[in-house]
Every structure is written in structure tokens, then in C-alpha cells.
């Protein structure tokens, strides 16, 4: 308009097709100024003088004279009585307001431009023509169908029916914005008062007034126009626009027409409403209360400051559940509040009592129907997840926040947090939040100790579950909050990691580590160990077999399971303790005297891989020096759950052995073991990777002895031992325990071997006797018959351990001792490489089992042939009887064994086992007592196996070297070590039966042949 009425309109060459000749007339402006300044008579005189017609209607003249606002006379001119002749009426020169535009504090849906599609317009007339519904009924229907927002722009609003629909929509959580013409607002206010409703008390309704443009005269007097727009905007998707005003007369008397608009054109109405709302103002009737709230310069919900206005307090108290709704859907606008730092995320106090355990006290709900609201968890964080207009609880409005702010006058705005237990007015009125303001920072353990334990009904209540709310994760945390009952299950992993990190940072490399007694703090007796071991039975089965350990790659063992966890791996130079003290659960206090052991029975390094030890001490400077200097001290370095103290055996240990039978993890009695270890604080999980013993001591009784295969095959020439120690001390620790894979490899090359488990009967005493007789017949064979029997077919003994499953056949080392013998004397480097390669996965170990035996094992068999004498027949019978005692065989196992014929068919025929020397009386008593024992298929879940091993088992391995080695592999029940050293360098691929073999091992125990 300005461009058309100025110089641009004088140039004919710039005219376009849209050019319209300007209609501006200067005498119009002068006539209006005369009317404003001097009245109606002066106006008419001016028109006569200028010889122009009257251009103002009588209604307009009356409106101007009624609404004109003149400035005071004393300020009309300056002090020098000069007038600003350059001033203008101002209608052509828009002024920018210095007042901040009001916010759509209830929120406003965001509509992506261009996504509403093409515009569609329907025309409605009043009275109705082709439509069934009238304009008023259509308006009511649109308000009922609203889900997010209802925006009304109206000149006059006095229709009671439409007003009731709006109030009811606000109680459903729909945001309602009403813009009324300022000059007609008094009519609307009168209507609401007649209906008994205080509109300013409604929490989800915002009512503001809009006036038209200001007309400024030359002298400074002004008047403003009216807002004559009339449209209804619902959810920013549908608009009703027309001449229909919300009055009774428009329904009954006036003719009107409206348009129902959807599509792209709605975006323009959206923009227009927000423009009108920005220029709107608080009605004069509400100005007093609004001025009190806005006095600090910021909105109440921005700074949390409340001025304690009596009227505002009444407003807050009177609005509680005035139109309470049952379904709580709506939430505050997250972008608005998060941008102002009002409700920061509760990351710092997410473990506090009020977030998880705290429940609000019951407060009677006097003004509304929703009493269950006080007992429901908060949906506060839904505000950050869901759209701000998916629904809102009607309490969360600035009117509600008025009273809530009274409790936070001393708090900074940024720290103001709503409690996550309840958002109701009642919870805020009781002042419960004030006690939560200055709580000092606490650790999680302290908060957990102070946490109010919720009952089962509160934890599992499904009264109301939102799809996106926080009550889901709160319920999840409550149901899984660690308690005294499930602390073992819930904190094992975290404590294990903490213990590992603490050991890595505080313990020197050669430290003994925490004692196993410390790790078992709280387990006072074997019964307690057995009871607590039930939690971790499932971890036993897979951890021993599938997780090999090397000194180069140490693993952390579970204190309760004894299993090895390969996920925590230390390097060779790490601070993790390298050895586990040779103390057991049943072991009495250790003495200062070393065990007297003849030096002639000490093992060479070449024979040490045959030791079926669960753990092997590796402290090279100490354990090996004991071997060279004082051979009698060696057995202290060997773990007591595998070695045999034949000097100090008592029949008292038999009960404990039977009690702890069929469990393959080491148990320790902390009350009886207190070695020098500095990191006892890591008693729950300390690295059980071969803790080193500074001073081996002689135990009075060694109780936890595994079945016959848990013996020390550690006797050979003293010269070889010294030679190996001098040449390759680092590899000694790597070769002290033989892997299950090595045993499989040893027996893999005998293709004619078949299992005899299918011949065995069910688990009964007669069956055990039958199996014992067959063993006696096999053991009593002469070496010549043994050779002939090995050529045809020999039974393979399946051995079972609760931790893992392994099929091992008998005596395969003896078939090829000479082939690998030349490799032994000159292969310390090969031994080191093979042991270093043993940290590979079990898959590689099983692939390597198929082709050839380990040269180290074969060479050991050859060397032992030169040393050990042959046993006597009596010794064979006794050792066989003792071996049967620890040989459970079940019908279920037989079925599984038949399924594994493919594996066993690849095994070589077994050598005849060689019996062990004569047992002592107490050992014989143990053998007989355990021989009568009937095994149950459920024993792995009830007991910890510690089968009795006679003291002569140590001697067994020294008497007849050529046969003992094979019998050790083939007939002895052995405990698989959780830290097995796989000699993968000597193995080759073994892939066909890998999946079946793995499943077989996980179902049953560890099959290692027992030694007689």
C-alpha cells in the first residue's frame, strides 16, 4: 500500500498488470484528525469547506468518538512550545513493539510445511441446505474430535453450548486457546459468570484479547479498531472460517456461511493464529492477577517464584480436579521447558529414594474423581519421549505451579525438579518435596540401604502402564533390585570386574593374591559351600572345557564356581596373581613342615603335562627351586584338591569327600586358611589364576581329592627335571597341566576302539559290581594278553565330571613312543611354542585332536618306561576297586554314549591299565566305602564331588611308567583343570564331530580316565 501511494506509482513505465491506481486522499486524513481533535461539528464544517462528501458512516463516527484516546495537554508539546510538524498519523508506518510476545505455554503442534496435502474446502450455510448438521453442530463435533489443540478466534463469544464443549475438552487435556475481540470481551466474561465458571481458573484454557490497528492522529490522539476475524482451528489440520459468530442469534436468526478447510491452506490459518496470539494481551479483568504473576519479569513456570497473591492462591486451590479426567494423556511442551532449564533430567538422583522406592502418602482427593493417581508412578519422562500433545495431565500447568512454587522459594530455578512419584496438586500441597532438597550425595550402596522396600503389590501393579512412560523401567529396577537373597546372582559380574581392576592396580606381580579363604568369606563349612554352589552350577559346565589358560593369557576364576573366565585376560607381566594357594575347603590348618616325599618320585618337566590338576602353581623361582633343592617340598605346590598326602590321610575325610563329590570346582574354608595375602578386600572375586605360594606348608589332611585321575604324574629322573628347569623355566608353568584336548588327541588315533558303556546296565549295586568285575579282569591281564587285546578291541571307559564332558580312551601314548621320542630331548623351544599356542579357542583344540598325539606326551611315556617298575597284581585289584568307587554310570549316560559312537569309533583301542601299588589300610577302607555308593543322576546339582583318592595314587604314576600313562588317560576319573594348557602345536584339524562333541560335553560331566 505504501509503495502504491508513493513515488513508485508516478512512473508509468513501472506499472504492471497488477497495478491499481491509488485511492489515497489527503483530505480523508485531515477530516479524521479534525473529528478526533474538535468533534463532529468541526468535522462537518471541514467537509463543507473542502467541498467533499461525507465518507464516514454514522456508526464509524460514533466508534471513533467513543474509543479515541487523547494525550495529556501538558505533554502535547515540548518545553519550547514547538510542535513536531514532521510527525504523521502513524497508520502507514508500523511500529515494532518492545513487549515480549506471549508464549503458547500449553504447547502447539508442529506441522511440517507441505505435508498436509492439497487444499479441500467445504461450504456450510445457515440455515443448512444440503448438510445434515448445522454450523453450530459442526462446531461442537469438531471440538469433540480434537486431540491436541483447539484454537478459536472470535469477535463475539456468548454461546453457552459451545462454551461447555470447550470446557469439557480442556478437562480431557486438550489445550484451548481463545482470542476474543477486546471491545466485546466483556460480553464473554458476563456469560461465563452467569454459568458459574471462573474462566481464569481453568488450567488448560488460555483466553486473551486482540484489538485492531491503532490509528494515530497528528496531535498524538489515537484509537484502535476491532478484531473481526472468525475461525476455529483444530489440531492444526482443520479450519472452520466464515461469518458465523458464537452467539445464539447466529444459530436462530442470522444468515451466515462458513468454510471447512483442510490441506495446505490450513498452514496459513496456523500462522495467522500465532500472529494474532503474539499481539494479544491479557484481558483487563485478569490484569491484576496476571501482573502479580508476571511481576519478576518472567513467567512463573520459568523461574518458580511465586508472589503469594491471595487471589492466585485461591485460583490454584479452586482448580484442583474441577474438570478432572480419568485418562491422563497430555504432557507439557518438552522443547519449551527443556530450553529454559526448568526440568533437567534426573540423572543425578535417578537412584534416589523418591525415584524408585518412594511412594507418596495418601492424601484425600476432595475435588476430583481420580484417587488412584496418588498411588501411580510418575510419567514425567514421557514428556521427553512422546509428542507434547499426545496428552497432558491437567495438573501440569502454570496455575498448578503457582502453589507448587511456594515450596521452592529458596531454590534456584535450574535445580527445580518435580518429584517423580506424583504430579498431583495434593502431593505438592503436603510439602513433601521440601524434605528432599538438601539431601547430601550418597553412594549407591547407602541409597540402597536406605531404600524403602516396596511390597509385591507395588512392584507388580499393573493398574496403569504407559507404553512410553518411566513406570516400565522403574518397575524393572524394583523387581530386580539386589537383595540379600539374590546378591550372589546380581553382583557377581560387577564385583568380579572390580576385583580384577583392583588386583591389577594394587597387587605386585609376584603377590600371592587374596586367599581363597578370603574369597569364601561367609562360607564357614562345606555345607555352606554346597548350598551356595547351587547358584553357580550352570557356570561350571562350560567354563572348564571351553576356556583354556596360559601364563601368557591368565584368566580370572570365580570364587564360587572355580570356573575360568576368559573375558578377563592378563598379560605375562600383569599384576594379577599367578597361583592359587593350595588350600581346600576341608583342609585343616597348614603346618610349617614340608611334606616328606622321596626325591626319586619327583616328576620331570616332560611328564608334568600329564597331571590332571585343576590348578597348577607356576611360581618359577620358588616352586622349581623346591624341586631342585628339596624334592620333598614339591607336593605342597600341587593343588590339594588333586594331589594326595599319603602320609596324613584319615578316614574322617571320607564323609566330606562323599559330601563334596561330583563337583569340580575347588572349595576353601576361609576359617582354616589364612595365608599372607594383601588383597583380602577382593574376597568375592579375586583372580584365581594360579596364585603363588610363598612358603608351601604341609597340610595335616588333604581332603578334596578328585577321583583316581587326580594324581601327580610327576615322577621321573632328577637329571631331566633339572635340565628342563635350567633350559626353559618359563615353559614349566605352561606344561604342568594336561588339557582335555590333549587327552582326546592321545586317544583319537586308535580307530578300533569302541565304547563299552552300551554294555553296562543301569545305576544299581549289581551293575557296579559287574563293572568292577570286568575292570578286574582287564587289569589282571598280562602284558602279552594286553597287547593282543589292544589290537582287537578294548573297551573305552567313559568318565564323567559335573563341570564338563570329555571322551578319553585308554593308553594311546604307548603305541607311538618311539616316533616322538627323538623330538623330546631337543624340543624345549617346541614345548614353549606349543604351550604358548594353547590359548586358542576350544574349537581349535578340538580340530587339532584328530591326527597325531602330542610328542611331549609320547616321549614322556617312553621315558617313563625306563624308570617305573611294574606293579603287583594285588595292587591292581585294590586300585581297580578304588577306581570303581568313583565311577558313576547311569542309564541316561548310556543312551548319550551310544549317540557318540562316531566319536568313540575314531578312538584307538585301549591299552590294558596297569594297577597301582598296594594301598594303605585307611586308603583301602576309603575305597571300599566309596565302592558301595550308589550314584544319582541329580548329584551334580546337589553335591560337590571330591571323591576319595588313595595316597598310593601318587605312587601309581611312578611304579610302571609304560602302562601308568595310558591307564591314567584311559581309566581314571580326572578333574579337568579350569586352566588347561592345550598343546595345539602338535594337533591337527578335527572338525567333523565338533557340534555333537560340544553338546555332549555340555550335557554331561568331564570324562577322563581314571588311574589305578
From Swiss-Prot:
Polar residues composition bias: residue spans: 575-588, 706-715
UniProt KW keywords: Cytoplasm, Membrane, Phosphoprotein, Proto-oncogene
Transmembrane segments: none
Residues with PTM Phosphoserine: 334, 422, 424, 466, 543, 664, 802, 852, 870, 916
Region called Required for interaction with RAF1 and for the function, residue ranges: 1-284
Region feature Disordered, mapped onto this chain: 410-440, 554-621, 691-891
Gene Ontology cellular-component terms listed: cytoplasm; membrane
Low complexity biased stretches: 557-574, 731-742
Modification note: Phosphorylated by CSNK1A1.
Keyword check for Membrane: yes
Location in the cell: Cytoplasm; Membrane
PANTHER family per record: PROTEIN FAM83A-RELATED
Quaternary organization: Interacts with EGFR; positively regulates EGFR inducing its autophosphorylation in absence of stimulation by EGF. Interacts with RAF1; displaces 14-3-3 proteins from RAF1 and activates RAF1 within the RAS/MAPK signaling cascade. Interacts with AKT1, PIK3CA and PIK3R1; activates the PI3K/AKT signaling cascade. Directly interacts (via DUF1669) with casein kinase isoforms CSNK1A1, CSNK1A1L, CSNK1D and CSNK1E.
Family as reported in the entry's similarity comment: Belongs to the FAM83 family.
Protein name, per record: Protein FAM83B
Source organism per UniProt: Mus musculus (Mouse)
Lineage, broadest ranks: Eukaryota, Metazoa, Chordata, Craniata, Vertebrata
Amino acid at each position: 500500500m505504501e509503495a502504491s501511494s508513493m513515488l513508485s506509482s508516478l512512473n508509468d513505465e513501472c506499472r504492471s498488470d497488477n497495478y491499481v491506481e491509488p485511492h489515497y486522499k489527503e483530505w480523508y486524513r485531515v477530516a479524521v484528525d479534525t473529528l478526533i481533535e474538535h468533534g463532529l461539528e468541526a468535522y462537518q464544517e471541514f467537509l463543507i469547506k473542502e467541498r467533499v462528501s461525507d465518507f464516514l458512516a454514522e456508526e464509524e463516527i460514533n466508534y471513533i468518538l467513543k474509543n479515541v484516546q487523547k494525550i495529556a495537554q501538558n505533554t502535547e508539546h515540548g518545553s519550547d512550545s514547538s510542535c513536531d510538524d514532521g510527525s504523521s498519523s502513524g497508520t502507514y508506518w508500523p511500529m515494532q513493539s518492545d513487549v515480549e510476545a506471549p508464549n503458547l505455554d500449553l504447547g502447539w503442534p508442529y506441522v511440517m510445511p507441505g505435508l498436509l496435502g492439497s487444499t479441500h474446502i467445504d461450504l456450510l450455510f445457515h440455515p443448512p441446505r444440503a448438510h445434515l448438521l448445522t454450523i453450530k453442530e459442526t462446531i461442537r463435533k469438531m471440538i469433540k474430535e480434537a486431540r491436541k489443540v483447539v484454537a478459536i478466534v472470535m469477535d463475539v463469544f456468548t454461546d453457552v453450548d459451545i462454551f461447555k464443549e470447550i470446557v469439557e475438552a480442556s478437562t480431557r487435556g486438550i489445550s484451548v486457546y481463545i482470542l476474543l475481540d477486546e471491545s466485546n470481551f466483556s460480553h464473554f466474561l458476563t456469560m461465563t459468570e452467569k454459568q458459574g465458571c471462573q474462566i481464569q481458573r481453568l488450567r488448560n484454557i488460555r483466553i486473551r484479547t486482540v484489538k485492531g490497528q491503532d490509528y494515530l492522529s497528528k496531535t498524538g490522539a489515537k484509537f484502535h479498531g476491532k478484531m473481526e476475524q472468525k475461525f476455529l482451528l483444530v489440531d492444526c489440520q482443520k479450519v472452520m472460517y466464515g461469518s458465523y459468530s458464537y452467539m445464539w442469534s447466529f444459530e436462530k436468526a442470522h444468515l451466515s456461511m462458513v468454510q471447512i478447510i483442510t490441506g495446505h491452506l490450513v498452514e496459513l490459518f496456523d500462522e495467522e493464529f500465532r500472529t494474532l496470539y503474539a499481539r494479544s494481551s491479557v484481558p483487563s479483568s485478569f490484569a491484576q492477577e496476571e501482573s502479580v504473576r508476571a511481576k519478576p519479569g518472567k513467567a512463573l513456570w520459568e523461574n518458580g517464584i511465586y508472589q503469594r497473591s491471595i487471589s492466585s492462591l485461591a485460583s490454584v486451590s479452586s482448580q484442583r480436579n474441577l474438570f478432572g479426567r480419568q485418562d491422563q494423556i497430555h504432557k507439557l511442551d518438552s522443547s519449551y521447558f527443556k530450553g529454559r532449564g526448568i526440568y533437567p533430567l534426573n540423572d543425578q538422583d535417578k537412584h534416589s529414594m523418591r525415584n524408585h522406592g518412594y511412594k507418596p502418602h495418601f492424601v484425600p482427593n476432595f475435588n476430583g474423581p481420580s484417587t488412584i493417581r496418588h498411588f501411580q508412578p510418575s510419567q514425567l519422562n514421557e514428556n521427553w519421549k512422546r509428542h507434547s500433545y499426545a496428552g497432558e495431565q491437567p495438573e501440569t500447568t502454570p496455575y498448578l505451579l503457582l502453589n507448587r512454587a511456594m515450596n521452592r522459594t529458596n531454590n534456584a530455578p535450574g535445580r527445580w525438579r518435580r518429584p517423580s512419584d506424583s504430579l498431583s496438586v495434593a502431593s505438592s500441597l503436603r510439602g513433601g518435596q521440601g524434605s528432599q532438597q538438601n539431601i547430601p550425595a550418597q553412594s549407591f550402596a547407602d541409597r540402597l540401604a536406605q531404600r524403602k522396600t516396596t511390597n509385591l503389590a507395588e512392584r507388580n501393579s499393573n493398574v496403569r502402564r504407559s507404553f512410553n512412560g518411566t513406570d516400565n523401567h522403574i518397575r524393572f529396577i524394583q523387581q530386580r533390585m539386589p537383595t540379600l537373597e539374590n546378591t550372589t546372582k546380581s553382583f557377581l559380574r560387577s564385583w568380579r570386574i572390580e576385583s580384577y581392576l583392583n588386583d591389577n592396580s594394587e597387587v605386585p606381580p609376584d603377590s600371592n593374591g587374596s586367599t581363597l579363604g578370603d574369597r569364601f568369606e561367609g562360607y564357614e563349612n562345606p555345607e555352606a559351600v554346597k548350598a551356595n554352589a547351587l547358584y553357580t552350577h550352570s557356570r561350571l559346565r562350560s567354563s572348564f572345557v571351553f576356556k583354556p589358560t596360559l601364563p601368557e593369557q591368565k584368566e580370572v576364576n570365580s570364587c564360587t564356581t572355580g570356573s575360568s573366565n576368559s573375558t578377563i585376560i592378563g598379560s605375562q607381566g600383569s599384576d594379577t596373581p599367578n597361583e592359587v594357594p593350595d588350600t581346600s575347603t576341608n583342609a585343616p590348618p597348614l603346618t610349617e613342615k614340608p611334606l616328606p616325599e622321596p626325591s626319586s618320585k619327583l616328576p620331570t618337566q616332560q611328564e608334568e603335562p600329564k597331571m590332571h590338576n585343576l590348578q597348577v602353581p607356576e611360581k618359577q623361582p620358588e616352586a622349581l627351586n623346591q624341586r631342585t633343592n628339596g624334592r620333598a617340598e614339591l607336593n605342597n605346590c600341587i593343588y590339594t584338591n588333586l594331589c594326595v598326602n599319603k602320609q596324613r590321610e584319615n578316614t574322617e575325610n571320607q564323609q566330606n569327600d562323599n559330601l563334596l563329590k561330583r563337583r569340580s570346582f575347588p572349595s576353601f574354608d576361609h576359617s582354616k586358611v589364612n595365608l599372607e595375602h594383601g588383597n583380602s578386600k577382593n574376597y568375592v572375586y579375586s583372580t584365581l589364576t594360579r596364585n603363588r605360594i610363598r612358603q608351601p606348608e604341609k597340610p595335616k589332611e588333604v581332603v578334596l581329592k578328585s577321583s583316581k585321575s587326580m594324581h601327580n604324574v610327576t615322577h621321573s629322573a632328577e637329571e631331566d627335571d633339572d635340565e628342563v628347569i635350567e633350559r626353559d623355566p618359563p615353559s614349566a608353568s605352561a606344561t604342568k597341566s594336561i588339557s582335555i584336548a590333549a587327552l582326546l588327541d592321545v586317544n583319537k588315533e586308535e580307530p578300533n576302539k569302541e565304547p563299552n558303556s552300551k554294555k553296562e546296565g543301569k545305576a544299581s549295586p549289581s551293575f557296579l559290581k559287574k563293572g568292577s568285575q570286568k575292570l578286574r579282569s582287564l587289569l589282571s591281564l598280562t602284558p602279552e594278553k594286553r597287547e593282543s587285546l589292544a589290537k582287537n578291541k578294548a573297551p573305552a571307559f567313559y568318565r564323567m565330571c559335573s563341570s564338563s564332558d570329555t571322551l578319553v580312551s585308554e593308553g594311546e601314548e604307548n603305541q607311538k613312543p618311539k616316533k616322538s621320542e627323538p623330538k623330546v630331548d631337543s624340543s624345549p623351544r617346541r614345548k614353549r611354542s606349543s604351550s604358548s599356542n594353547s590359548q586358542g579357542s576350544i574349537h581349535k583344540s578340538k580340530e587339532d585332536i584328530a591326527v597325531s598325539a602330542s610328542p611331549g606326551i609320547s616321549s614322556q611315556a617312553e621315558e617313563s618306561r625306563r624308570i617305573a617298575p611294574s606293579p603287583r597284581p594285588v595292587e591292581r585289584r585294590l586300585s581297580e576297586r578304588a577306581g570303581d568307587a568313583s565311577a558313576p554310570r547311569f542309564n541316561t549316560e548310556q543312551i548319550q554314549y551310544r549317540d557318540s559312537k562316531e566319536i568313540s569309533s575314531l578312538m584307538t583301542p585301549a591299552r590294558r591299565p596297569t594297577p597301582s601299588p598296594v594301598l594303605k589300610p585307611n586308603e583301602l577302607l576309603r575305597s571300599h566305602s566309596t565302592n558301595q555308593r550308589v550314584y544319582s543322576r541329580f548329584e551334580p546339582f546337589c553335591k560337590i564331588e571330591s571323591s576319595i583318592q588313595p595316597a598310593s595314587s601318587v605312587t601309581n604314576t611312578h611304579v610302571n611308567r609304560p602302562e601308568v600313562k595310558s591307564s591314567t588317560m584311559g581309566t581314571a576319573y580326572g578333574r579337568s583343570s579350569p586352566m588347561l594348557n592345550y598343546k595345539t602345536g602338535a594337533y591337527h584339524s578335527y572338525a567333523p564331530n565338533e557340534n555333537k562333541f560340544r553338546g555332549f560335553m555340555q550335557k554331561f560331566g568331564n570324562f577322563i580316565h581314571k588311574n589305578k
